[in-house]
């Protein structure tokens, strides 16, 4: 199951951080590392700081875009240390671990970490179902990348160990199949095109409404069957609009 947990690093700028993250992952039983458009490629420093976790570095998936790293995932959680203008469903690290293990039993889960200096952009955070914030000392809350990964990875491992020790998993059981990130993005594209065609949103300012709708559907988290119903509704609206 732990192989289904992806640690995704976006535009990492120091190879030493890649190695330190790999070490933090492997100590908690995680090995699935994805690097999104890294500003430098893994090198000897990454291997040195991996300290026995060089296999995690060697097997890392390197992709150009975040969408590629999220493809096939049913749950995406992004790390965020700042309050945003558009509030989003939040988890603490323990909740993140529980939810990741529950859903990781059935489909890949992505835990996304941003750039060393500026974190994730708002656009990247809007691709996530939830945001997770680490409740560090408010007077000195600066965690480096590997520290943040270690905290989240530890909570994932604790949730996984609890599930192993119980006849019934000690995590929330996800009965309903949730759509993959790819399916959700197609739905958002379909929704935007339909709302543009009906004149509900303006072609030159679609973002504000679409961002709020993304937040709404992220909070509601429709199941796969429910998403298919929504897609059918949009198709029906399109047909009616064409007939006018």
From Swiss-Prot:
Protein residues bound to S-adenosyl-L-methionine: 79-81, 114, 134, 141-143
Key word Iron present: no
Superkingdom: Bacteria
UniProt enzyme class: transferase
Gene Ontology CC, one term: cytosol
Entry's EC annotation: 2.1.1.200
Keyword Cytoplasm attributed: yes
Key words of the record: Cytoplasm, Methyltransferase, S-adenosyl-L-methionine, Transferase, tRNA processing
Alphabetical GO biological process terms: tRNA nucleoside ribose methylation
Localization: Cytoplasm
Molecular function via GO: RNA binding; tRNA (cytidine(32)/uridine(32)-2'-O)-methyltransferase activity
Catalytic activity: cytidine(32) in tRNA + S-adenosyl-L-methionine = 2'-O-methylcytidine(32) in tRNA + S-adenosyl-L-homocysteine + H(+); uridine(32) in tRNA + S-adenosyl-L-methionine = 2'-O-methyluridine(32) in tRNA + S-adenosyl-L-homocysteine + H(+)
InterPro entries (UniProt xref): Alpha/beta_knot_MTases (IPR029028), RNA_MeTrfase_TrmJ/LasT (IPR004384), SpoU_MeTrfase (IPR001537), tRNA_m1G_MTases_N (IPR029026)
Task of the protein: Catalyzes the formation of 2'O-methylated cytidine (Cm32) or 2'O-methylated uridine (Um32) at position 32 in tRNA.
Assembly and oligomerization: Homodimer.
Family note: Belongs to the class IV-like SAM-binding methyltransferase superfamily. RNA methyltransferase TrmH family.
Name of the protein: tRNA (cytidine/uridine-2'-O-)-methyltransferase TrmJ
């Amino acid at each position: 199951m732990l192989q289904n947990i992806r640690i995704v690093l976006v535009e990492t700028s120091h190879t030493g951080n890649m190695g330190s993250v790999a070490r933090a992952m492997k100590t908690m039983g995680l090995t699935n590392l994805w690097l999104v458009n890294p500003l430098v490629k893994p090198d000897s420093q990454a291997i040195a700081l991996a300290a026995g976790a060089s296999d995690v570095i060697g097997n890392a998936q390197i992709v150009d875009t975040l969408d590629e790293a999220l493809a096939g995932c049913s749950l995406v959680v992004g790390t965020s240390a700042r309050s945003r203008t558009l509030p989003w469903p939040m988890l603490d690290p323990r909740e993140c671990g529980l939810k990741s293990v529950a859903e990781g039993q059935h489909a890949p889960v992505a835990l996304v970490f941003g750039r060393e200096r500026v974190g994730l952009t708002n656009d990247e955070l809007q691709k996530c179902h939830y945001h997770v914030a680490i409740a560090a000392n408010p007077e000195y809350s600066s965690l480096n990348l590997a520290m943040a990964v270690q905290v989240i990875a530890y909570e994932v491992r604790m949730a996984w160990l609890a599930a192993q020790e119980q006849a019934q998993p000690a995590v929330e059981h996800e009965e309903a199949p949730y759509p993959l990130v790819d399916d959700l993005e197609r739905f958002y594209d379909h929704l935007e095109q339909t709302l543009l065609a009906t004149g509900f949103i303006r072609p030159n300012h679609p973002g504000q409404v679409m961002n709020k709708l993304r937040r709404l559907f992220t909070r509601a988290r429709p199941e796969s069957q429910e998403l298919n119903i929504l897609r059918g509704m949009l198709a029906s609206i399109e047909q009616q609009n064409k007939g006018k």
